[in-house]
C-alpha cells in the first residue's frame, strides 16, 4: 500500500513553487510512524502525570529513567501480559493502580491496552489505510496530483502555480501500471 501511494506521489512534495514556508508533504501511514507516535503520546502522558504515578520516586533522574523504561516496552518483541505490566510498574516503583489526569483506567491497564497492544501494525491498521481512515494525511495538492495521474494514464507531473513554467529538473514520472487498468477507471 505504501509503495503504491509513493508511486502516485503521495507523501512527497508536488513541485508547487511554495518556498516560504516550504511546501508541506503528506504522511503515508506505516508501522514505524505508528510506533513513533504512540511512544510520543505515552511519554507525554507519563510526563504530565509524574506527580500521580511516580510519587514514590524522589529525583527527576529516577522519574526520567522510569519514563524511558516504560516507553521502551513498546519495542518488546513479545508484548507483556497485564500481570507482567503490573509487576513491571511495581518494580519501577511506579503506582500502577493510579488513574492519570483525564483517564478512566489505572496506569497498568492504560499501558497494556492503549499502548502495548496497539504498538505493532496489524490487519486493522491496513484496513483503515485502505479505506482512507487512520493516519492518512495528504495535502490537497497531493490529492490533485494523484487524481491527475489517474486521469491521464499514469503520468505524474510536477504541479505548478505559474503558467508555462518548465520543470526541467523534475521530469514526468510514470506510475508504472498497465494502461488497461486506466481504461477501467
Locate predicted features.
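Beta-lactam-recognizing serine transpeptidase/beta-lactamase-like catalytic domain environment
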Residues: 1-184
Amino acid at each position: 500500500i505504501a509503495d503504491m501511494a509513493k508511486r502516485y506521489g503521495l507523501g512527497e512534495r508536488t513541485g508547487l513553487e511554495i518556498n516560504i514556508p516550504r511546501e508541506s508533504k503528506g504522511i503515508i501511514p506505516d508501522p514505524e510512524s505508528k510506533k513513533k507516535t504512540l511512544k510520543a503520546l505515552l511519554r507525554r502522558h507519563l510526563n504530565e502525570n509524574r506527580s500521580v504515578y511516580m510519587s514514590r520516586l524522589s529525583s527527576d533522574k529516577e522519574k526520567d529513567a522510569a519514563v524511558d523504561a516504560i516507553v521502551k516496552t513498546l519495542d518488546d518483541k513479545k508484548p507483556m501480559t497485564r500481570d507482567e505490566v503490573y509487576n513491571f510498574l511495581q518494580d519501577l516503583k511506579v503506582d500502577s493502580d493510579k488513574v492519570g489526569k483525564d483517564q478512566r483506567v489505572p496506569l497498568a491497564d492504560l499501558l497494556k491496552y492503549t499502548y502495548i497492544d496497539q504498538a505493532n501494525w496489524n490487519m486493522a491498521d491496513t484496513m483503515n489505510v485502505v479505506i482512507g481512515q487512520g493516519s492518512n494525511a495528504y495535502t490537497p495538492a497531493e490529492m490533485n496530483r494523484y487524481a491527475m495521474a489517474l486521469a491521464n494514464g499514469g503520468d505524474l507531473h510536477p504541479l505548478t502555480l505559474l503558467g508555462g513554467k518548465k520543470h526541467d529538473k523534475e521530469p514526468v514520472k510514470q506510475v508504472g501500471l498497465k494502461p488497461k487498468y486506466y481504461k477501467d477507471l
